[in-house]
């Protein structure tokens, strides 16, 4: 019986190579600015409007507790799509650079070692080696954590409420100014 192979898009973060299931990759985009939202974790950079869909953008370096890096011409955003609980989640992850696409069968993917309770390995799906490289395979389901997305939804709602309040206040002040002039 033939072993099923799965393709992974690999990318770089601080010199390490990571991979995500290519079936979860919607597209790869060059880095472009985002709309920042208030009251969000530092690794959530903000949101973009991609063909009418608002997509949260997460800096994977910061999410993994790595040192921040100034974005450059190699910095890309990988748009990931995942279906969970009858809900489609779409999130962009900012990475240093895209590397390659590799195929791995289940036999070549090793389980991530247990690091103890001090190290969070929940993102790890496994490890795969190709030639002399070790590639860290990420679990997209965990990467697209709904709790993080809830924080973004909440921040978006707060930003929308603040904008509405500002417009109402400006309208009220304008009416009051007109009434004073007409009096």
Regions found by a protein language model. Give the residues of each.
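An acidic, low-aromatic, low-complexity terminal/linker signal
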Residues: 1-183
């Amino acid at each position: 019986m033939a072993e099923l192979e799965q393709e992974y898009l690999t990318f770089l973060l601080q010199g390490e190579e990571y991979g995500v299931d290519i079936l979860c990759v919607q597209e790869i985009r060059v880095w472009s600015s985002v709309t920042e939202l208030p009251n969000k974790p530092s690794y959530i950079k903000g949101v973009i409007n991609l063909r009418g869909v608002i997509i949260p953008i997460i800096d994977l370096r910061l999410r993994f507790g790595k040192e921040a890096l100034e974005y450059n011409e190699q910095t890309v955003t990988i748009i990931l799509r995942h279906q969970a609980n009858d809900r489609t989640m779409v999130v962009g992850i900012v990475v240093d650079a895209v590397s390659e696409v590799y195929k791995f069968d289940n036999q070549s993917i090793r389980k991530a070692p247990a690091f103890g309770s001090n190290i969070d390995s929940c993102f790890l799906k496994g490890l795969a080696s190709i030639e002399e490289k070790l590639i860290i395979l990420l679990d997209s389901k965990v990467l697209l954590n709904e709790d993080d997305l809830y924080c973004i939804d909440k921040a978006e709602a707060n930003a929308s409420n603040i904008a509405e309040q500002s417009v109402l206040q400006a309208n009220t002040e304008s009416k009051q100014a007109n009434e004073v002039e007409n009096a």
